[in-house]
């Protein structure tokens, strides 16, 4: 039986998922306010999907971090088919507008097992601590910190690490090293085999952690869900 002293969790598609209404509403903002060439809502939603996938893939490939503002500007420019569409767009103001859409249409818990399993895990391993290690794209860490308490995750994590705040993305070992350093600073020395990183991405989460000598468990993108963690304790 493996009993870990610290559980590091990915966030998106591990503990939470996007609100379908959010994807519609964010495209509506761009269509109504940043759409000089009159593209349809469907066209703008399709551009968002492309930029979302591309942005995540680029961050994983380079280990760096594209800023949320850059991604929104890409959407506006690509949808319009011209960089002239960016004239007069203020990136910080644009992000503030888009953050309001997230706050009005917050992410949802991944599934009904998520919060009960985390609570059971805490009861079974009361000495264990939890943290987040999350790549971000259109939604920054500062915005996620605002919405997580409303999802029943308040007080669950000793600390939260987001790629936009760290300037690096999983699987970059620099990001996993930040996890180890933060862990040592908050709970003292801990051996890597006493930590487990849990996520849905075989490259960013599993390979990234294992390259640093940290055990890793894949959930949700395979045939096992978060309840698998209870079978390990």
Give residue ranges: language-model regions.
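Asp-based, Mg2+/Mn2+-dependent phosphohydrolase catalytic module
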Residues: 1-9, 17-18, 39-42, 115, ...
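N-terminal helical cap/lid subdomain that shapes the substrate entry/recognition surface
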Residues: 2-116, 124-126, 141
């Amino acid at each position: 039986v493996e009993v870990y002293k610290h559980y590091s969790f990915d966030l998106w598609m591990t503990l939470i998922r996007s609100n379908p209404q959010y994807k519609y509403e964010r495209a509506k903002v761009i269509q109504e306010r940043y759409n000089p060439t009159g593209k349809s809502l469907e066209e703008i939603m399709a551009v968002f999907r492309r930029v979302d996938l591309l942005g995540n893939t680029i961050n994983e490939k380079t280990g760096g971090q594209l800023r949320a503002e850059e991604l929104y500007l890409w959407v506006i420019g690509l949808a319009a088919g011209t960089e002239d569409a960016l004239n007069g767009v203020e990136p910080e103001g644009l992000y503030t507008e888009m953050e309001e859409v997230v706050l009005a249409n917050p992410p949802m818990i991944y599934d009904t097992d998520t919060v009960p399993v985390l609570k059971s895990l805490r009861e079974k391993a009361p000495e264990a601590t939890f943290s987040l290690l999350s790549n971000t794209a259109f939604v920054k860490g500062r915005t996620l910190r605002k919405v997580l308490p409303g999802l029943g995750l308040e007080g669950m994590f000793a600390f939260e690490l987001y790629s936009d705040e760290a300037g690096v993305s999983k699987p970059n070992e620099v990001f996993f090293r930040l996890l180890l350093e933060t862990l040592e600073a908050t709970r003292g020395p801990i051996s890597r085999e006493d930590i487990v990183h849990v996520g849905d991405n075989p490259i960013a989460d599993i390979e990234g952690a294992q390259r640093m000598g940290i055990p890793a468990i894949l959930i949700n993108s395979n045939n096992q869900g978060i309840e698998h963690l209870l079978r390990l304790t």
